[in-house]
From Swiss-Prot:
Record-level GO cellular component terms: membrane
Chemical reaction(s) catalysed: a quinone + NADH + H(+) = a quinol + NAD(+); a quinone + NADPH + H(+) = a quinol + NADP(+)
The enzyme's E.C. designation: 1.6.5.2
Cofactor(s) listed: FMN
Lineage per the UniProt record: Bacteria, Pseudomonadati, Pseudomonadota, Alphaproteobacteria, Hyphomicrobiales
Binding-site residues for FMN, renumbered to this chain: 10-15, 78-80, 113-119, 134
Residues reported in the UniProt entry to bind substrate: W98
Protein name, as recorded: NAD(P)H dehydrogenase (quinone)
Species for this entry: Afipia carboxidovorans (strain ATCC 49405 / DSM 1227 / KCTC 32145 / OM5)
PROSITE patterns for this protein: FLAVODOXIN_LIKE
Gene3D superfamilies the record matches: 3.40.50.360
Length: 199
Protein backbone atom coordinates (compact mmCIF):
# COMPACT_ATOMS: atom_id res chain seq x y z
CA UNK A 1 0.00 0.00 0.00
CA UNK A 2 1.23 3.49 -0.85
CA UNK A 3 2.39 5.37 2.27
CA UNK A 4 1.80 9.12 2.41
CA UNK A 5 2.96 11.63 5.01
CA UNK A 6 1.16 14.96 5.35
CA UNK A 7 3.71 17.11 7.17
CA UNK A 8 2.58 20.53 8.34
CA UNK A 9 3.02 23.57 10.55
CA UNK A 10 -0.07 25.51 11.60
CA UNK A 11 -0.10 28.40 14.06
CA UNK A 12 -3.83 29.15 13.97
CA UNK A 13 -5.45 26.01 12.55
CA UNK A 14 -5.91 26.97 8.89
CA UNK A 15 -3.11 24.73 7.63
CA UNK A 16 -4.20 22.01 10.05
CA UNK A 17 -7.61 22.02 8.32
CA UNK A 18 -5.95 21.94 4.89
CA UNK A 19 -3.69 19.07 6.04
CA UNK A 20 -6.73 17.04 7.05
CA UNK A 21 -8.30 17.67 3.63
CA UNK A 22 -5.07 16.68 1.84
CA UNK A 23 -5.06 13.47 3.88
CA UNK A 24 -8.71 12.78 2.99
CA UNK A 25 -7.86 13.02 -0.69
CA UNK A 26 -4.87 10.71 -0.36
CA UNK A 27 -7.00 8.16 1.49
CA UNK A 28 -9.62 8.34 -1.29
CA UNK A 29 -6.85 7.07 -3.59
CA UNK A 30 -6.31 4.06 -1.33
CA UNK A 31 -3.15 5.30 0.41
CA UNK A 32 -2.16 4.76 4.01
CA UNK A 33 -1.80 8.30 5.39
CA UNK A 34 -0.13 9.76 8.47
CA UNK A 35 -0.55 13.39 9.47
CA UNK A 36 2.31 14.84 11.51
CA UNK A 37 3.34 18.36 12.50
CA UNK A 38 6.76 19.87 12.93
CA UNK A 39 7.90 21.10 16.35
CA UNK A 40 6.89 24.56 17.54
CA UNK A 41 9.85 26.91 17.99
CA UNK A 42 7.98 29.80 19.63
CA UNK A 43 8.23 29.81 23.44
CA UNK A 44 5.05 28.46 25.04
CA UNK A 45 4.15 31.70 26.80
CA UNK A 46 4.52 33.69 23.57
CA UNK A 47 2.46 31.17 21.59
CA UNK A 48 -0.28 31.26 24.23
CA UNK A 49 -0.32 35.07 24.32
CA UNK A 50 -0.57 35.14 20.50
CA UNK A 51 -3.52 32.69 20.67
CA UNK A 52 -1.76 29.96 18.70
CA UNK A 53 -3.86 26.81 18.28
CA UNK A 54 -1.93 24.54 20.63
CA UNK A 55 -4.42 21.65 20.85
CA UNK A 56 -3.57 19.97 17.54
CA UNK A 57 -4.14 16.22 17.43
CA UNK A 58 -1.31 15.34 15.03
CA UNK A 59 1.84 13.93 16.61
CA UNK A 60 5.15 15.75 16.23
CA UNK A 61 7.28 14.40 13.39
CA UNK A 62 10.91 13.32 13.55
CA UNK A 63 13.20 14.02 10.61
CA UNK A 64 14.02 10.33 10.19
CA UNK A 65 10.30 9.68 9.59
CA UNK A 66 10.59 11.15 6.10
CA UNK A 67 12.41 8.12 4.69
CA UNK A 68 9.48 5.83 5.56
CA UNK A 69 7.01 7.23 3.02
CA UNK A 70 6.41 7.03 -0.73
CA UNK A 71 5.02 10.59 -0.78
CA UNK A 72 5.46 13.63 1.46
CA UNK A 73 3.05 16.56 1.21
CA UNK A 74 4.27 19.66 3.04
CA UNK A 75 2.08 22.50 4.28
CA UNK A 76 2.83 25.69 6.17
CA UNK A 77 1.53 29.21 6.46
CA UNK A 78 3.37 32.01 4.71
CA UNK A 79 5.90 34.11 6.59
CA UNK A 80 6.84 37.16 4.53
CA UNK A 81 6.64 35.28 1.25
CA UNK A 82 8.38 32.10 2.35
CA UNK A 83 7.74 29.04 4.47
CA UNK A 84 7.59 29.40 8.25
CA UNK A 85 10.80 29.12 10.25
CA UNK A 86 9.37 26.06 12.00
CA UNK A 87 9.10 24.16 8.72
CA UNK A 88 12.41 25.49 7.40
CA UNK A 89 14.15 24.41 10.60
CA UNK A 90 12.71 20.90 10.28
CA UNK A 91 13.65 20.50 6.62
CA UNK A 92 17.13 21.93 7.29
CA UNK A 93 17.73 18.99 9.63
CA UNK A 94 17.19 16.51 6.78
CA UNK A 95 20.73 16.96 5.48
CA UNK A 96 21.64 13.42 6.49
CA UNK A 97 18.76 12.01 4.44
CA UNK A 98 19.78 14.26 1.54
CA UNK A 99 23.39 13.03 1.74
CA UNK A 100 22.26 9.39 1.56
CA UNK A 101 19.76 10.05 -1.24
CA UNK A 102 17.08 8.62 1.04
CA UNK A 103 14.33 10.77 -0.48
CA UNK A 104 15.22 10.29 -4.16
CA UNK A 105 12.20 9.41 -6.26
CA UNK A 106 9.63 10.04 -3.56
CA UNK A 107 6.64 12.15 -4.60
CA UNK A 108 6.24 15.56 -2.99
CA UNK A 109 3.86 18.46 -2.96
CA UNK A 110 3.18 21.71 -1.12
CA UNK A 111 0.23 23.68 0.24
CA UNK A 112 0.02 26.99 2.08
CA UNK A 113 -2.04 29.87 3.44
CA UNK A 114 -1.74 33.64 3.41
CA UNK A 115 -3.64 36.46 5.08
CA UNK A 116 -4.39 38.16 1.75
CA UNK A 117 -4.96 37.22 -1.88
CA UNK A 118 -1.52 38.46 -2.88
CA UNK A 119 0.36 37.64 0.29
CA UNK A 120 3.02 35.39 -1.21
CA UNK A 121 1.28 32.07 -1.77
CA UNK A 122 3.22 31.09 -4.88
CA UNK A 123 6.56 32.22 -3.43
CA UNK A 124 5.89 30.14 -0.33
CA UNK A 125 4.99 27.10 -2.42
CA UNK A 126 8.21 27.57 -4.39
CA UNK A 127 10.24 27.81 -1.16
CA UNK A 128 8.90 24.40 -0.16
CA UNK A 129 9.16 22.89 -3.65
CA UNK A 130 12.81 24.00 -3.90
CA UNK A 131 13.61 21.88 -0.85
CA UNK A 132 11.76 18.90 -2.28
CA UNK A 133 13.65 19.13 -5.55
CA UNK A 134 16.98 19.31 -3.71
CA UNK A 135 15.95 16.12 -1.92
CA UNK A 136 15.49 14.46 -5.33
CA UNK A 137 11.73 14.25 -5.09
CA UNK A 138 9.17 14.27 -7.91
CA UNK A 139 6.89 17.28 -7.35
CA UNK A 140 3.16 17.23 -8.08
CA UNK A 141 1.13 20.43 -7.86
CA UNK A 142 -2.57 21.24 -8.13
CA UNK A 143 -3.22 20.72 -11.82
CA UNK A 144 -6.00 22.37 -13.77
CA UNK A 145 -8.05 19.19 -13.62
CA UNK A 146 -9.24 20.90 -10.43
CA UNK A 147 -11.70 23.34 -11.97
CA UNK A 148 -12.18 25.20 -8.67
CA UNK A 149 -9.11 27.33 -9.30
CA UNK A 150 -10.38 28.59 -12.64
CA UNK A 151 -13.24 30.90 -11.60
CA UNK A 152 -13.23 34.53 -10.50
CA UNK A 153 -16.66 34.72 -8.85
CA UNK A 154 -15.34 34.24 -5.34
CA UNK A 155 -12.18 34.95 -3.40
CA UNK A 156 -10.38 31.63 -3.33
CA UNK A 157 -6.94 30.12 -3.03
CA UNK A 158 -5.34 27.60 -5.34
CA UNK A 159 -2.47 27.67 -7.81
CA UNK A 160 -0.99 25.11 -10.18
CA UNK A 161 1.92 24.81 -7.72
CA UNK A 162 -0.27 23.70 -4.80
CA UNK A 163 -3.46 24.09 -2.82
CA UNK A 164 -3.83 27.32 -0.84
CA UNK A 165 -6.24 29.18 1.42
CA UNK A 166 -6.69 32.83 2.37
CA UNK A 167 -7.17 33.54 6.09
CA UNK A 168 -7.81 37.33 6.27
CA UNK A 169 -5.54 39.55 8.31
CA UNK A 170 -7.10 38.59 11.63
CA UNK A 171 -7.31 34.89 10.76
CA UNK A 172 -11.10 34.93 10.85
CA UNK A 173 -11.60 33.36 7.42
CA UNK A 174 -11.49 29.57 7.53
CA UNK A 175 -10.68 27.48 4.45
CA UNK A 176 -13.64 27.51 2.07
CA UNK A 177 -15.16 24.31 0.72
CA UNK A 178 -13.58 25.08 -2.65
CA UNK A 179 -10.13 25.44 -1.06
CA UNK A 180 -10.59 22.22 0.91
CA UNK A 181 -11.66 20.48 -2.29
CA UNK A 182 -8.45 21.70 -3.92
CA UNK A 183 -6.46 20.23 -1.04
CA UNK A 184 -8.32 16.93 -1.37
CA UNK A 185 -7.71 16.89 -5.11
CA UNK A 186 -3.98 17.50 -4.65
CA UNK A 187 -3.72 14.81 -1.96
CA UNK A 188 -5.51 12.32 -4.19
CA UNK A 189 -3.36 13.19 -7.22
CA UNK A 190 -0.12 12.84 -5.26
CA UNK A 191 -1.20 9.48 -3.81
CA UNK A 192 -2.18 8.23 -7.27
CA UNK A 193 1.18 9.38 -8.68
CA UNK A 194 3.09 7.69 -5.86
CA UNK A 195 1.18 4.47 -6.47
CA UNK A 196 2.14 4.56 -10.16
CA UNK A 197 5.80 5.12 -9.31
CA UNK A 198 6.14 2.84 -6.30
CA UNK A 199 3.42 0.23 -6.83
Amino acid sequence: MTKVLVLYYSAYGHIEAMANAVAEGAREAGASVDIKRVPELVPAEVAKAAHFKLDQAAPVAKVEDLANYDAIIVGTGTRFGRMSSQMANFLDQAGGLWAKGALHGKVGGAFTSTATQHGGQEMTLFSIITNLLHFGMVVVGLNYGFAGQMGVKEVTGGAPYGATTITDGDGSRLPSENELNGARYQGRTIAETAKKLHG
